[in-house]
Structures are given as C-alpha cells and as structure tokens.
C-alpha cells in the first residue's frame, strides 16, 4: 500500500471588503411639466381627426392606452415610415410595413396602443395587429375604407394583447373622432408608458405660397437607442407620428423622413437598447390646399411636391421636417428614465458625417460617462476612452483630438472649458469652473477630431439611481 499522505490543514481567512465610494445624496429628478405644450386649433394640421380611450391594457384605471388618427380627406394621405432594424420586429411593425407596400405609400391613418408591445408574440400577435388595423378601417365612412390603417404598439415585450378589449373599444373611438386641441393632447397621452409627460408639438410654416401646418407626437423614456430605416424591402421603445397638411408625394415624403430621422431620432440614446417596436410614421394629406370662408373646411387643390419636380420646395419641407423631428426627439431624452441631465455630444471636424455620428454615439452610450454626468464629475478620460474604441471607417488620429465642456446659457462665463488639446491634456483645468458647468441641467461636450469638416450631434442623458429603480420594477 502506498504511504498515507498527510492532508494539510486548511486555514480560512476573511477576504477584506473593497472600499467603494458611496453616494451621500440622491438628486431629485427635475420637473418636466414645462415641456407640456397646448396649441390653438389654427396651429394644428387640417384634415385630421383623432380620438383616444382606456381599453384596459394599462393597469391604472382610466389611463389612456388606445388611440387613433384618421385623415378625413377624400384621398388617402401620403405615408412614410422609419422602423426598427431589430431582427425581433414586433407584429405591428411587420403589419405597417406590409400596409405601406400594398398601399403604394398611402394610408388612411393609424391606431396605437400602449402597455403591451405585441412583440415576440408569434402568429397570434400578427393576427391581433391585423385585426386592429382592419377593424378601424371597417368602422370608417365608406369613402374612407379603400386603404389600410397603420398599427403601432408599445409596452411589455412577450405578452399577448387583450385583443377583445381593444376591438370592443374601436367603434367608440371612431364615433368620438374630432380635431380639438384637447383630443390631440389626449392622443399623445395614449402613447405613454414610463413617460412622465405627454409629448406633443405643432407649428406652421410657409411652403411656397401656402401656409402649412405640422403636428407631432412621440413617446419614450427607456429602451432608447433607435436605428430606424425605411420599410424593407423599400417601398419604443420609441414611437412617433408626424402629421402635416402639406401635399407631398409618397416617395418624396419617405426620402425627407429618412433624412430627418437619421439626424434626429437616430441620434438619441437613453440606455443604448434598441427596441423591437421603434416606429416613426409621417402622414401628409394635402389639406392645406385652400381654406374656405366657413370654419376649417378645405378644398384639396395643392399639387403634390416631388423631389425632382419641385426641388426648392422639397428642400424647404425636408429641413422643416428635420428641425421638427429634432425637437420631438430631444423631448424623449429630456424624459429619460430617472434623468437629471440633458447632454448634447457634438463631434466636429470629422472626415465624414458617419464618423462624427459614430463617435458621438459611443460617448453617449458609455455608462461610465453617463454616471459621471450624474455625479457632476469632470472625468474627461471616460470621454476619450469612448472615442478611442469607436469603430470607424476612417482611423481617428489621437494627437488631432481636442475635448471641451461648453457652458449652457445660464452660466455667466460662456467660454468653452478646454480639457484636451491635440491629444495633450490641459495642464491646469479649472475644476471649480467645471463644477459650475456640470451643475446645470443642460450640458454639452464638444469633441474636435481635427481631421475634416463634417459634424454630428447626439443627445443623451445621465444614469441615476432612479433608472435602476424604474427598470428593476417595470412589470410590477
């Protein structure tokens, strides 16, 4: 037998705990009430009617969770959409894509529900989305039934819709359609999930010789990092709708929306999570053609603007749409879950727009950067780290890069605070001045790549304790 081997005694020791700085204060989330706007009837687009109701999708009794918008014009509206690129596209995204393709880029309106995303819900989810669309269309006056109703949903992923409750409410919705400012505001509330305020904007502008109007609604506070494109094949979660009474052809509307979304909604992020349901729908019904003397009745006499046939008017419309979409997109960031800061990341002097956009998104999605903004900590090394790992087609040259904090309008000294110049850190950064700048609700970080003339802006928010609290109990 082999000799026995003595078993060594095992000595156990307590592992010392690692000291970690703890927050001594929890900042309250700023009030968002000043972002809620109401509008007079004259500013809202002509030829649309809206309605909303409670369909028992949300748990809170009476909470608006189902809404519709319909173009009341004889001719269906031109319709365009930018939709999520997530491979797990929700059923309403699939249905909307098919309706836009079969309708030749025209639609009568849309139906939206909040509280349930109808995403990853299989064959039944698709059937439910189609039933929502078809039921709205069947309830409209006979002259408005020739083309489909688009569908949007937002809420919890993987749960079935209470479809019977939804369908039973649609006749009531259609009967209550009107164009009052209150109904528009209520419609914006029917989009909300974790949002803290309804997001409605409207304005008018000149398009050629005519005054046209545009209104927009969006929602979103978490699961925000959109990457949306046109329906595939060519023709939020973040949800949004933009309705205008301008006359724009479907191809021109899709082209303008692609341009606008890539410079607005695709340039926001709250938490870096792309939703299965992200959708921006744009409708243009041409009802601004001519105002009659009685009330708000219209005669549709505007020729539809095309990209090649009306290049100057198209460019004006595209820029107005971009600016309007940017304002709507920024509302989502300002309502970011638990957010206390609104942060603009501006990357300039890049070799291409795509490079500038990619660098700005890397910074905006960095959890370390976002927590530093919450802590009002001028830790600019986290900015450089995010710049450095950005995958770009053109290589970033470290000794060309400069970084600055840009003071908000409320700070007495408007001079940018330079942190890094041509890859070299500033020798004596004024930490007191940095604290003053970072104490503001609105912040801006400027990154100069020193290697071109292109620029992009991305908007984000900070990460707070409240973000974890909200998302840790989302379904409860």
From Swiss-Prot:
Residues binding substrate, per UniProt: 193, 219, 237, 337, 471, 476
Main location class: mitochondrion
CDD domains given in the database record: OAT
Entry's EC annotation: 2.3.1.35, 2.3.1.1
Sample GO molecular function, one term: glutamate N-acetyltransferase activity
EC class name: transferase
Protein name: Arginine biosynthesis bifunctional protein ArgJ, mitochondrial
Species of the source: Cryptococcus neoformans var. neoformans serotype D (strain JEC21 / ATCC MYA-565)
């Amino acid at each position: 037998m082999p000799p026995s081997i003595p078993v060594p005694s095992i000595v156990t020791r307590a592992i010392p705990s690692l000291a970690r700085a703890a927050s001594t204060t929890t900042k309250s989330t700023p009030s968002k009430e000043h972002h809620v706007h109401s509008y007079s009837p004259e500013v809202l687009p002509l030829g649309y009617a809206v309605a909303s109701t409670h369909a028992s999708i949300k748990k809170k009794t009476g909470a608006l969770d189902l809404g519709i918008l319909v173009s009341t014009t004889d001719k269906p509206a031109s319709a365009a959409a930018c939709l999520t690129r997530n491979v797990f596209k929700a059923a309403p995204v699939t249905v909307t894509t098919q309706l836009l393709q079969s309708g030749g880029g025209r639609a009568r309106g849309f139906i939206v529900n909040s509280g349930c995303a109808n995403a990853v819900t299989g064959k039944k989810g698709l059937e439910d989305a189609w039933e929502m669309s078809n039921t709205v269309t069947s309830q409209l006056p006979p002259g408005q039934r020739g083309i489909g109703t688009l569908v949007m949903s937002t809420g919890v992923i993987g749960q079935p819709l209470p479809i019977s409750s939804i369908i039973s409410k649609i006749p009531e919705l259609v009967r209550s359609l009107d164009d009052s400012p209150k109904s528009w505001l209520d419609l914006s509330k029917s989009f909300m999930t974790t949002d803290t305020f309804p997001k409605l904007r409207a304005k008018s502008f000149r398009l050629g010789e005519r005054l046209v109007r545009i209104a927009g609604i969006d929602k979103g506070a978490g699961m925000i990092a959109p990457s949306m494109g046109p329906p595939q094949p060519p023709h939020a979660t973040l949800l949004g709708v933009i309705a205008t009474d301008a006359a724009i052809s479907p191809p021109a509307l899709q082209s303008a929306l692609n341009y606008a979304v890539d410079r607005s909604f695709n340039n926001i992020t709250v938490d870096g999570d792309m939703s299965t349901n992200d959708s921006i729908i744009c409708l243009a019904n041409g009802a601004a053609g001519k105002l009659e003397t009685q009330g708000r009745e219209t005669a549709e006499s505007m020729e539809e603007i095309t990209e090649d046939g009306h290049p100057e008017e198209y460019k004006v419309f595209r820029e107005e749409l971009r600016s309007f979409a940017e304002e709507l997109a920024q509302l989502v960031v300002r309502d970011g879950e638990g957010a206390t800061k609104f942060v603009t990341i501006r990357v300039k002097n890049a070799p291409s727009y795509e490079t500038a956009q990619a660098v700005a998104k890397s910074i905006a999605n960095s959890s370390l950067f976002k927590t530093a903004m919450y802590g009002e900590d001028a830790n600019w090394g986290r900015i450089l780290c995010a710049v450095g790992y950005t995958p770009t087609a053109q290589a970033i040259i470290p000794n060309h890069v400069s970084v600055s904090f840009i003071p908000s309008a409320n700070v007495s000294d408007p001079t940018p605070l330079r942190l890094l110049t041509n890859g070299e850190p500033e020798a004596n950064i004024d930490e007191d001045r940095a604290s003053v700048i970072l104490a503001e609700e609105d912040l801006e970080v400027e990154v100069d790549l020193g290697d071109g003339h292109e620029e992009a802006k991305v908007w984000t928010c900070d990460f707070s304790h409240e973000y974890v609290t909200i998302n840790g109990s989302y379904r409860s």
